[in-house]
């Protein structure tokens, strides 16, 4: 027997004591706050890591992930035990629903909240949304003291985090409470905590930490066990196929039940492994030589070596070649899994289903007979291995049991954006938790991008007190905003709604002196009126002087009374002695006293409404530059005021590519995009014209730096551009190619997840959000 294996078996061997209580049945002797557990001389530490998009990756990407995962396995030290665990944990249904459903507010909008909640509940029913999958890597090592163990885990923990980061998986070491929570969830299910976990209080009172996590009762039978009122069974992989597909583990775990699957790995030093295989090869060659000698003695000189001997020789040589030339390591492994059910009948049915999945992959799973206790202690991430039905594996054959499937997005307190196209789980993201929560929604006309944005607006309007500002070039949001009690501002030369370009109060801008920023804005206004870039230094000085004169009385009155307008600015220019002043007045006359004077009137709309829709559809080409300037100034100052009051602001800009036709609006949004996170705000850009948007280097930079993107159905030319810019694989591109309305890819924090999103047509919310003719 290999020295490493015999040593591990000897050190893990311990006397069996009949447990006299449920607490004694839990094989943890001692714990430390940093998450290290002790059992005899063995110390263990658990690391939680996130899933990655293995299922939808291209063949080349899968190969790369496989090699990176193999590298992680090769990095495991000899003499340790590693346990990779997938935990299908059932979420408390009431808590889950409470976290995503909208509470009623009795503000006249509860009808919409009820509809929205019904839609969410329909998405939960019949899916795995009550099951949350977590992944752990538990490392166990024999050490003399906790200090030695802590030093070791500090080193190996860094290696584990680094190797998993190469796979785009985030890993973290679990502290004592997080680690014990795994066992509590398994043993107690949905039973609420009677008291919070506090290690110091346990020590102070002289009680055991096991009281917090252990079940009321545990009964072990020949081939199953019972925890409280629930039934469970431990299975193990008895026989493996010659070739195992890499999706077997994900298929076994794609099951709407509480289950835990663990793969125990015992790495062997390469020198020991090579020596062992050489000895085995020598034994095989000796058997072949002895067989040939017997045949020769019988004058049978042409006899062919028996197939079984030839196969042994071939497989042993291949194994030796793997170890010596292909950087493979020998490992001993065992796969175990435990599943729970509410009844014995359901348990037997689930067991048969799991066994059939294994048979489909030409593997043989079996129930542990009279070893359910040892099996349970092996499969749970204690860091122990009580079942010794070990199989000799190489790095490659171990890596085939890859624990990755598809990424999920489930951030507490977030917004529902659809369902994972692979797992059908809800995708709930919280943009406030991202480093840069700005977003783009990209898709061809009719792909569902404005509907998706409206869904987000509905959630924000019904669930939060945040302010929502919409730049609406196509009048698409008018009906929804009015239904939600918002203010629609029609910005045009003929509209009865007016926005005063000279609006200013004490909170204007982000400086101590609002006049400084307002004067700078007035210069920008007159640049648009006279012609971009045509203001001379003398004209700028005249405008600055006039602005100070116009605002003097208003500022002295404490920003009360009538706010000056561009007409006051015109009169002040006419009073100046310089010829240039009259030239400025004449150049701007069309927009102040002429037919396009809508921004020279006092503001007559409620700019304090929390939902504002700036409808600029009828803003003509002549008025568009000035209209964009005034509208964007109004939006930005609302953001600043909200920031000072501690409020969050969400800005939605439809047909985003239009903004990049004008230098001022393009520069404004670029600056806003970079700065708005500082002011507790978030920008969302929507566009169908991706190709035109990507012609702007500024827009490309904004798109590449966005942490949250929703990509819907794309035109072929746009797909290629986006794939290159956002590093989207060919397989992932298939999810934005000729797909159903509302389906596509979500990119969140660098993770790309395919999604689908449908909304019932027989609801009032759908009629408010749809833009399809005949449905609204």
Label each region the model flagged:
Residues 1-404:
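Extended, folded cores of ATP/NTP-driven motor/assembly subunits in large transport
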Residues 52, 59-78, 85, 89, ...:
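P-loop NTPase motor domains
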Residues 441:
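Hydrophobic anchor at the beta1->P-loop junction of P-loop NTPases
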Residues 449:
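Conserved lysine of the Walker
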Residues 452:
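Hydrophobic positions on the alpha1 helix immediately C-terminal to the Walker A/P-loop
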Residues 459-469:
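Post-Walker A helix-loop "phosphate-sensing" segment adjacent to the P-loop in P-loop NTPases
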Residues 468-471, 650-652, 676, 682-688, ...:
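Structural recognition of the conserved hydrophobic beta-strand(s) that form the central parallel beta-sheet
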Residues 485-489, 698-711:
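A short helix-turn-beta junction within AAA+ P-loop NTPase domains corresponding to the substrate/partner-engaging
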């Amino acid at each position: 027997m290999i020295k490493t294996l015999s040593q591990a078996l000897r050190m893990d061997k311990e006397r069996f004591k009949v447990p006299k209580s449920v607490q004694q049945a839990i094989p943890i002797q001692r714990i430390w706050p940093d998450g290290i557990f002790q059992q005899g001389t063995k110390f263990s530490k658990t690391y939680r890591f996130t899933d990655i998009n293995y299922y939808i990756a291209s063949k080349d990407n899968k190969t790369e992930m496989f090699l990176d995962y193999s590298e992680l396995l090769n990095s495991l030290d000899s003499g340790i035990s590693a346990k990779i665990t997938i935990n299908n944990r059932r979420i408390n249904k009431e808590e889950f629903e409470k976290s995503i459903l909208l509470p009623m507010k009795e503000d006249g909008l509860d009808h919409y909240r009820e509809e929205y909640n019904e839609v969410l509940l329909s998405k939960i029913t019949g899916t795995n949304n009550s099951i949350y999958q977590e992944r752990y890597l538990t490392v166990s090592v024999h050490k003399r003291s906790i200090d030695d163990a802590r030093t070791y885990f500090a080193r190996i923990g860094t290696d584990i985090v680094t190797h998993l980061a190469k796979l785009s998986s985030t890993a973290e070491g679990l502290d004592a409470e997080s680690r014990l929570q795994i066992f509590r969830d398994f043993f107690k299910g949905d039973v609420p905590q009677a008291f919070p976990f506090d290690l110091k209080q346990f020590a102070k009172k002289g009680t055991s930490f096991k009281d917090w996590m252990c079940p009321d009762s545990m009964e072990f039978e020949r081939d199953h066990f019972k925890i409280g009122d629930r039934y469970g069974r431990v299975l193990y992989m008895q026989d493996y196929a010659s070739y195992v597909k890499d999706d077997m583990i994900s298929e076994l775990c794609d099951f709407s039940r509480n289950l835990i699957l663990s793969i125990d790995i015992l790495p062997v030093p390469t020198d020991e492994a090579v020596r062992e295989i050489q000895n085995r090869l020598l034994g095989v060659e000796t058997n072949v030589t002895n067989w040939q000698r017997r045949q020769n003695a019988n004058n049978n000189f042409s006899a062919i070596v028996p197939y079984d001997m030839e196969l042994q020789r071939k497989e042993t040589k291949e194994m030796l070649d793997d170890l010596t030339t292909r950087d493979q390591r020998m490992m001993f492994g065992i796969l175990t899994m435990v599943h729970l059910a509410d009844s014995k009948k359901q348990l037997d049915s689930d067991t048969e289903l799991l066994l059939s999945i294994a048979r489909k992959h030409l593997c043989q799973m079996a129930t542990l007979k009279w070893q359910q206790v040892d099996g349970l202690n092996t499969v749970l991430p204690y860091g122990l291995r009580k079942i010794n039905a070990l199989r000799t594996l190489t790095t490659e054959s171990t890596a085939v049991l890859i624990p990755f499937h598809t990424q999920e997005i489930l951030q507490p307190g977030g917004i529902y954006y659809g369902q994972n196209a692979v797992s059908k789980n809800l995708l709930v993201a919280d943009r406030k938790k991202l480093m840069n929560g700005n977003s783009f929604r990209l898709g061809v006309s009719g792909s569902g991008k404005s509907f998706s944005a409206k869904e987000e607006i509905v959630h924000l309007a019904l669930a939060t007190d945040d302010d929502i500002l919409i730049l609406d070039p196509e009048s698409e949001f008018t009906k929804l905003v009015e239904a939600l009690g918002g203010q629609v501002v029609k910005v045009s030369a003929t509209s009865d709604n007016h926005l005063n370009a000279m609006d200013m109060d004490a909170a204007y801008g982000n400086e101590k002196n609002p006049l400084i920023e307002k004067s700078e804005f007035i210069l920008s206004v007159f640049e648009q009126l006279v012609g971009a870039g045509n203001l001379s230094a003398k004209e700028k000085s005249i405008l600055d002087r006039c602005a100070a004169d116009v605002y003097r009385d208003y500022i002295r009155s404490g920003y009360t009374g009538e706010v000056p307008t561009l007409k006051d600015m015109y009169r002040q220019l006419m009073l100046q002695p310089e010829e240039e002043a009259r030239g400025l007045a004449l150049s701007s006359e069309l927009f102040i006293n002429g037919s396009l004077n809508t921004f020279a009137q006092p503001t007559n709309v409620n700019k304090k409404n929390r939902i504002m829709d700036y409808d600029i559809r009828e803003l003509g080409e002549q008025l568009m530059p000035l209209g964009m300037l005034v509208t964007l100034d109004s939006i930005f100052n609302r953001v600043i005021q909200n920031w000072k009051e501690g409020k969050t602001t969400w800005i939605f800009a439809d047909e985003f590519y239009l903004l990049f036709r004008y230098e001022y609006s393009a520069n404004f949004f670029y600056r806003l995009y970079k700065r708005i996170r500082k002011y507790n705000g978030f920008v969302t850009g929507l566009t169908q014209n991706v190709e035109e948007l990507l012609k702007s280097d500024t827009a490309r930079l904004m798109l590449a730096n966005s942490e949250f993107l929703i990509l819907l159905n794309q035109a072929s030319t746009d797909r290629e551009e986006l794939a290159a810019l956002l590093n989207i694989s060919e397989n992932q591109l298939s999810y934005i190619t000729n797909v159903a309305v509302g389906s596509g890819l979500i990119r969140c924090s660098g993770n790309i997840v395919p999604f689908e999103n449908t909304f019932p047509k027989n609801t009032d919310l759908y009629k408010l959000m749809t833009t399809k003719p005949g449905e609204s």
